[in-house]
Amino acid sequence: MQVQNNIASINAARNQGIETGKLKKSLEKLSSGFRIVRAGDDAAGLAISEGMRSRINSLNQAMRNIDDGIGLTNVGDGALTEVHSMLQRLKTLALKSANGTYDQSNRETLNMEKDQILEEIDRIGSTTKFGEISLFSRADANTNTQLWQPPELDDTIPLQIGGSAQAGEVLDVERYYIGSKELQLDQTNFSTVEKGQKSVEYIENAIEAVSKVRASFGAAYMHLDHTHNNLSVTSENMQAAESQIRDTNMAEEITKYTSSNIVLQSSNMMLTNANNLPQTILELLK
C-alpha cells in the first residue's frame, strides 16, 4: 500500500475528467440540437454542411425573387386587362362611326369618348409600376418627362431566379412601352365613315399588340411558377440532407448522456473511496 502516490485516486480522477467532458459535449448537443457544435466535432461534416446552408439560403432568396417576379407579371397583366377592355370599347365606337347612319353631332360624341379612352390608356401606360419600376413607360432622369418608345420590345427587367450567377439563372422579363402613340391609336378618327373604317384597322392592330405583350407576361409567369416549384423541392431535399449531417440524433445522444452520467457518478464514488484508502494506514498505526 502506497502513501505518496494514490494511484487509484489518480485513475478515478482522470476517468472523472473524461466523463465530465463527454457529459458537457452531450449537453451542448442536446441543448443546441446540433451534432456538430464546433469544427472539432466533425470537420468534414461541418464543411459540407456550411456549403449546403449557403446553397439553401441562396435557393430561398431566389424563391423570394421569383415571388417578386410573379407579382410584377400580375401587375402588368392586370393593367393590360383594362387596356384590352378599353380597346374593345374603342373598336365598338369605331364600328359605329363606320356606319353612315351617324350625323356629325353623333360623331363628335364618339370622338369625345374615344379621346377619354386614349387618355386613360396613356395614364395606365405611364403610371403602372411595380414598386418604383415603370412597366410600360420610361421617365427621363433629367426632364422627368415620358419618353415613349414603339410598341415593341425595348428592354428587359432581369430577375435572379437561381441560387448563383451562372448562365440560365437570370430570367429577362420583356418590357414594352405602351401608350396611344405606340399603339397608333392617335391615328384614329371617327369624324367620317372612311376614317371610322380605317380606325377599326388601327384598333385591331392595337388589340393584337397588347395580346402579344400579355402573352409575354403569361409566359414569364409560367416560367417563374415552374421554377419556384422546382426550387422549393430542391431546397426541401437539401435541408433534409443538411439536417442528417449537422443535427443531433436525440435518441442516440440521450443514450450517450445517460451512459456518461452513470459512469461519472460511479467515478465520483470510486474517487471518494480511493481517497479514503490512505486512512486505513492510520488504522494500522493505532
What are these regions (language model features)?
Residues M1-S9, R38, E50, M63, ...:
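Amphipathic alpha-helical coiled-coil/heptad-repeat segments
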Residues M1-N5, S9-A12, L27, S232-K286:
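Proline-poor, low-complexity alpha-helical tail modules
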Residues N15-K24, E50-R64, L264, N268:
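Parallel, heptad-repeat alpha-helical coiled-coil signal-transduction segments
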Residues G33-G51:
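Short amphipathic helix-turn modules centered on a small-residue break
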Residues T20, S49-M52, I56-L59, T73, ...:
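Coiled-coil helix of the DHp
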Residues E19-E28, E82-L93, N230-A240, Q244:
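Extended, amphipathic, non-transmembrane alpha-helical segments
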